[in-house]
């Protein structure tokens, strides 16, 4: 068996040579990169320092050493990566940093770091220059170890590796395979015995296209690839799509390739966060850096369900948590889990969750321990790599920049990647993206640590990025049989782009419209959009077209809320037990009532705002009501509310504020601490004003707060009635339930006073039913009379506390209740007839179901449908009043 060696520059070329060797049944063949070649020659299982080890040692050097100029870089994000990149350039250039150290303090600092790295390398590892020197010193056995050497795929050879190849040529035969395009780049081989074999240039079929945006370029590239495959002109492993740098197209490729199901291999790897292990690491980093929260912790631990520490947790453990609790601090989690542990029917989650949450709550300083204890396999590798690339405080950013190898086989797939890699294994069908003045060629930049005034760039980088882009362009062009040049008119932000100077002037460009109908679609969605007739016959298209037309019609249609009369789902929503809120929506927005109570639609969760700057009006009202309830209940049970003094009310209110603040921290999204304290003070003042409002005292008055009726849970423990008794609206089959803010009764339960506290802006005049928006007084009066037959008079009032507040008693309750019953009858008839149209409640700026309405409903939809709506609702329209 004859031993021979092939030296290649990239992993893509390694895959190709390995596949070719398998096809040829080759024996005794070694496929090596230059660093592997040096390690093989040096012997003793030596290898060049890896990227991860280099990052780790440079990070340690920054922590341990003292510097003249690099001291300020010690804690800066990206410092480790920048220093490693500079050191690699120095090593590639075959420069002796120790000899240059005396020139400037900057070079001295870098030489100090290099010495530290060299001294702390693990056994079996050497710096690149040292490894090459060791290999050259051990060339006597090169013929036996390597056999004949073939070098292929290189566009540029760094001086460090040139030294190795030139020395190796004296010990064994080297045959260098290249393309005629690179003849000038290989003049350094002429003094040696290296035999250079030039492959002649090909004359490719050249096409140039101009697209609208980078995303459009990706779409057209995938269409082109599918056309080549289905026409039989090319197979996937003969097709390459390249760019000088891939960042502007990567995300679009990832999404569109998944949609197209084309076999595409990402040469440069996939984004770590597009993989499951990357999501595990990223979600954990988010919790660690941004802090504990309900959403963040649940998401992270659900992704980590397979780690040993969480295997004892049931799969649905998170459903036991309160859905509205933000749980922003470790103490909140401890109290919440303590309450869950009191339920004997549920497992105790504390032994599993609390140690993990305590570790995560330590933040960035615990990053290494978090990765060690909570991650495994590739997720841990991603975590550790991100810690090497940057400080723990930037972990989420570092993870987002990482790439992991694509596990698909490039020998069976279309390849997408950077030109410098694809040029090492060019393909007959090539499409170049981004041929604009910005990308082909890219403009070179000075090294961040060794600019031109410190070290000549020609020494540090003999071939800059601009020269390399030109070389790679020529290599790909001259190696292809069919090549397409592609550029976009504008970038993703809309800026106009110039044409690359590398584009052949003799090739006329074809301008492609983004909305054009392609001959070959790259995916099913692309095909359907290209075939309008076929798309129009799909269920989704028919529904969309029908909705589009109906929303623009002056008549009311099914898309405006018209359904068959007697719909059982709507009937069930009507016959449910109602609150003042549901009846308000029934009267002011029948369509919203159906969405909310028949279909079960809900507005977005409040957890989407984990720490709002201010409480919204509804939440502030809940806070004030909680303060009123707890304070009044305490005072009533300690001598009676009617006999209390202002000092007693203030003292009880302070204690209630303390309890409620603790309770809300565990269950509600709250503003930052200082804003929350101010909100508590405002709510406390509002509650004090309400509790001290001068109201005439009833004889032998008893006060009840948060009084439930109709089967509603919670509220006052000592109700003056059966809390489960059915309350119905006379003349209707509507059942009521609710909670009265405050109920005062005299000793004989003959006279009653119902108070509904309001925390909004006080109106200038008596609001009445307010076009269906103020129903509480009338409904609560109905409930009190139904549940307490001895009651003769009910004073139902709205109380707006505060210096500019007022008390509004319901004028002529009998008339108001009769009017309410009448309009409720109209609303029920409208719903049962299938005419659930929008009302003034839908047009309100506070409509929390506005997301389900057409876009710009205020400007177009509501005015367009108003006339037809008004004609349909009849007398209900006069109750709504003027919008």
Language model feature labels by segment:
Residues 146, 159-211, 484:
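Conserved RecA-like helicase ATPase core segment
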Residues 2-33, 42-47, 189-883:
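Anion-coordinating catalytic cores for phosphoryl-, nucleotidyl-, and glycosidic chemistry
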Residues 1-3, 139-147, 168-170, 425, ...:
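Flexible, charged surface loops at secondary-structure boundaries
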Residues 4-10, 150-151, 174-178:
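Short, hydrophobic beta-strand segments that form beta-sheet elements in well-ordered domains
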Residues 11-145, 154-159, 166, 181-182, ...:
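Basic/charged alpha-beta structural segments of nucleotide/phosphate-handling enzymes
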Residues 153-161, 421-424:
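Alpha-helical hinge/cap motifs
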Residues 110-130, 147-150, 201-215, 457-460:
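Acidic/glycine-enriched edge-of-secondary-structure segments
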Residues 83-96, 173-177, 584-592:
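Structured, non-catalytic alpha/beta "coupling" segments that mediate domain-domain communication
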């Amino acid at each position: 068996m004859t031993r021979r060696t092939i030296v290649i520059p990239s992993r893509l070329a390694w895959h190709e040579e390995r596949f070719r060797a398998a096809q040829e049944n080759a024996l005794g063949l070694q496929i090596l990169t230059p660093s592997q070649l040096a390690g093989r020659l040096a012997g003793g299982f030596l290898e060049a320092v890896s990227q991860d080890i280099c990052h780790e040692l440079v990070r340690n050097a920054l922590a341990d050493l003292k510097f003249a100029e690099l001291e300020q870089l010690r804690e800066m994000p990206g410092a480790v990566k920048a220093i490693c990149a500079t050191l690699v350039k120095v090593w590639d250039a075959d420069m002796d940093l120790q000899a240059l150290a005396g020139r400037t303090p900057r070079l001295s600092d870098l030489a100090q770091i290099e010495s530290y790295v060299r001294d702390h390398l693990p056994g079996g590892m050497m710096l690149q220059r040292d490894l090459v020197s060791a290999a050259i010193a051990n060339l006597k056995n090169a013929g036996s170890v390597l056999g004949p050497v073939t070098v292929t795929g290189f566009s540029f050879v760094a001086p460090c590796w040139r030294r190795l190849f030139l020395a190796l040529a004296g010990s064994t035969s080297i045959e260098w395979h290249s393309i005629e395009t690179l003849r000038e780049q290989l003049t350094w081989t002429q003094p040696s015995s290296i035999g250079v074999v030039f492959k002649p240039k090909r004359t490719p079929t050249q096409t140039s296209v101009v697209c609208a945006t980078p995303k459009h370029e990706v779409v057209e590239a995938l269409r082109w690839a599918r056309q080549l495959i289905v026409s039989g002109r090319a197979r996937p492993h003969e097709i390459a799509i390249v760019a000088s740098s891939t960042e502007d197209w990567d995300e679009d490729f990832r999404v569109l390739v998944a949609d197209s199901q084309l076999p595409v291999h990402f040469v440069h790897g996939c984004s770590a966060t597009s993989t499951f292990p990357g999501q595990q690491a990223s979600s954990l980093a988010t919790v660690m850096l941004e802090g504990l929260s309900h959403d963040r912790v649940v998401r992270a631990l659900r992704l980590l369900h397979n780690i040993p520490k969480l295997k004892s947790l049931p799969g649905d453990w998170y459903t036991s948590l309160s859905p509205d609790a933000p749980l922003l601090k470790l103490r909140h989690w401890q109290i919440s889990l303590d309450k869950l542990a009191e339920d004997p029917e549920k497992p105790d989650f504390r032994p599993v969750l609390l140690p993990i949450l305590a570790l995560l709550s330590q933040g960035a300083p615990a990053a290494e321990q978090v990765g060690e204890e909570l991650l495994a396999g590739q997720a841990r590798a991603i975590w550790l790599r991100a810690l090497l690339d940057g400080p723990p405080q930037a972990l989420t950013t570092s993870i987002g920049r990482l790439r992991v190898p694509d596990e698909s086989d490039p020998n069976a797939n279309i390849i997408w990647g950077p030109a410098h890699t694809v040029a090492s294994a060019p393909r007959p069908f090539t499409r170049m993206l981004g041929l604009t003045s910005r990308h082909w060629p890219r403009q070179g930049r000075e090294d961040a640590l060794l600019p031109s005034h410190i070290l000549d760039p020609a020494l540090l980088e003999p071939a800059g990025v601009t020269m390399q882009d030109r070389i790679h362009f020529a290599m790909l062009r001259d190696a292809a049989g069919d090549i397409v040049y592609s550029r976009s008119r504008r970038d993703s932000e809309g800026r106009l782009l110039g044409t690359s100077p590398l584009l052949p002037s003799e090739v006329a460009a074809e301008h492609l419209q983004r909305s054009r109908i392609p001959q070959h679609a790259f995916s099913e969605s692309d095909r359907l959009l290209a075939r309008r007739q076929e798309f129009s016959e799909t269920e989704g298209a028919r529904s969309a077209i029908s909705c589009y037309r109906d929303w623009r019609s002056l008549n009311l249609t099914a898309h405006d809320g018209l359904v068959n009369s007697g719909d059982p789902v709507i009937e069930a929503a009507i016959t449910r037990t109602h609150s003042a809120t549901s009846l308000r929506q029934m009267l002011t927005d029948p369509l919203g009532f159906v969405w909310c109570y028949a279909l079960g639609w809900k507005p977005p969760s409040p957890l989407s705002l984990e720490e709002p700057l201010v409480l919204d009006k509804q939440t502030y009202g809940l806070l004030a009501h909680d303060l009123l309830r707890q304070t009044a209940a305490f005072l009533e049970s300690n001598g009676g509310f009617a006999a209390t003094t202002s000092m007693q009310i203030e003292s009880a209110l302070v204690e209630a504020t303390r309890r409620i603040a603790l309770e809300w921290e565990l269950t509600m999204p709250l503003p930052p601490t200082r804003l929350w304290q101010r909100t508590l003070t405002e709510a406390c003042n509002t509650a004090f004003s309400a509790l001290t409002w001068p109201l005439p005292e009833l004889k032998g008055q008893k006060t009840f707060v948060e009084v439930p009726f109709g089967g509603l849970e919670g509220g006052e423990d000592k109700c003056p009635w059966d809390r489960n008794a059915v309350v119905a609206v006379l003349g209707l089959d509507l059942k009521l339930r609710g909670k009265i803010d405050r109920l005062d009764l005299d000793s004989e339960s003959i006279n009653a006073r119902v108070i509904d506290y309001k925390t909004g802006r006080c109106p200038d005049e008596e609001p009445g039913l307010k076009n269906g928006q103020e129903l509480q007084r009338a409904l609560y009066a109905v409930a009190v009379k139904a549940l307490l037959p001895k009651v003769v008079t009910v004073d139902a009032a709205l109380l707006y506390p505060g210096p500019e507040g007022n008390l509004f008693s319901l004028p002529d309750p009998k008339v108001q209740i009769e009017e309410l019953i009448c309009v409720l009858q109209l609303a029920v008839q409208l719903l049962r007839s299938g005419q659930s149209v929008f009302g003034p409640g839908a047009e309100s700026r506070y409509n929390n179901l506005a997301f389900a309405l057409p876009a710009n409903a205020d400007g177009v939809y509501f005015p367009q449908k108003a006339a037809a709506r008004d004609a349909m609702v009849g007398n209900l329209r006069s109750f709504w009043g003027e919008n």
